[in-house]
Amino acid sequence: MRGFQESPAGGPSAAIAELDPEERAVIARVVADVGLLLGGEPFGMEIDVADVDDDPLFRHFRGFESALTDPDDPAVLRILPNAAPDDRDVADEFRRFTEPELRSLKVDRLRTIWKALNEDGPEWIIPAADAMSTAAALTDIRLVLASRLDMETDDDAAALYAEIDRAHDTVTGRYLADNAQNPERVWLGMLYQALTWLQESLMSYVMRDDVMRDDVMRDDV
């Protein structure tokens, strides 16, 4: 995996990362499953419920379908927070009028990522005009993963990273689930780490003056 870097000079501005086929497949699958959580139509790589128990990495996603109508689900509240946390009636009314459009926007962003990850070749190419929306979608994915990992504070994140480090085999340089007390949590945490790193590299590209200017101009159109 290589983080996002600016495309070569001479062509349209874009952020380009490199992922191997397995990395692309894992990220695309999570993207699709978060889209399903938001009520989107199947992207094409969603969890086969019959196989979930045999897939340690995605066992944490069990119950996403039932969470669609449950605004109290922690993962849903992370990406679709209540507008009035202290007044359930007001919050529910606000959701009724605003949530469908917001869900649709988030699903569209996820679908754009999913399509890019299913292109041939190792490169994940994000045009400058799509960089901010892609970063926002990555935030949604990371929020869902953080919820499933019970990460609420910086201390929780530090504990997770320490757990991952303990599972690392320093001889081969590979993460070995057998070394962890909770292998599924370690694998999910590794995915969270990878997406965080990718998002940070994308934001480094976004924060360039010309990219920010192009994004503002597009929003003004």
Regions found by a protein language model. Give the residues of each.
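Charged, alpha-helix-forming regions
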Residues: 1-108, 112-211, 218-221
